[in-house]
Structures are given as C-alpha cells and as structure tokens.
UniProtKB/Swiss-Prot annotation:
GO terms under cellular component: membrane
Protein name as annotated: Putative uncharacterized membrane protein YER076W-A
Localization, UniProt: Membrane
Additional free-text comment from the UniProt record: Partially overlaps YER076C.
Keywords: Membrane, Transmembrane, Transmembrane helix
Primary location group: membrane
Domain of life of the source: Eukaryota
Length: 115
C-alpha cells in the first residue's frame, strides 16, 4: 500500500506527468548540446588566443605554423593544446623537438622534404 503522504497519479494526471517528463528529457538533451557547443567555443577561443600570442613572437612563428599544419592534417584540437603548452614551458624549442613530439603523440612520422 502507498504511504499516507504519497499520491500516485492516475488517468489524466499520469498522462500530464509523462508529458512533463518527456519535456524535461528534451530540455536536458538541449542543454547537453548547448554545453557541447559552449565547450567547443571555449576551445576555439583558446586557439584564437594562441594564434595571437604566438604570432607576436617572431622566433615562434615557424614553430606555430608547423604545429598548426600538423593539427590541420590530423584534425585534432587536443594535440594543438598540448603542443602550445609544450612550446610555452620550453619543452619544444626547435623543429626537431616538434617533429619528435608529434611522432610520439600520434605515432605518425612526418618527414621534412627539401627541394
């Protein structure tokens, strides 16, 4: 038996409760999609910030262009974030360091072709 304070909806009220539940699930799904777009927007803002910061330092322009080329090929935003953090902390200071880092991170070897 139901407890004294508990009211189980029946008939029309049960139908209304189901509609409310379906609406709340749709809202939750909508908010989940919005959260995904928001996080992608934050990543895009971070990438734009990196473009501005790294392009101001002349000796980092080549490294940035190479890392951006790798990321464009691999289509991987997380790799761009890790490359940028390694450039800032000083782990990547040359093109060879960048090649080695990308090779270790993705197990893909890129060779520099000279004309």
């Amino acid at each position: 038996m139901a407890s004294p304070g508990f009211h189980r909806p029946s008939g029309r009220s049960q139908h209304v409760c189901m509609r409310i539940t379906i609406r709340s699930h749709k809202k939750m799904r909508r908010y989940s999609i919005l959260r995904s777009f928001f996080s992608l927007g934050l990543i895009a803002c971070f990438c734009i910030f990196l473009i501005i910061v790294l392009s101001e330092e002349p000796n980092m322009r080549l490294l940035y262009k190479l890392s951006y080329g790798y990321v464009k090929i691999l289509n991987n935003v997380k790799l761009l974030e890790s490359i940028a953090s390694c450039i800032r902390c000083g782990r990547i200071t040359s093109v060879n360091d960048l090649n080695q880092f990308v090779f270790q991170s993705t197990a893909v070897f890129f060779t520099n072709k000279t004309d």
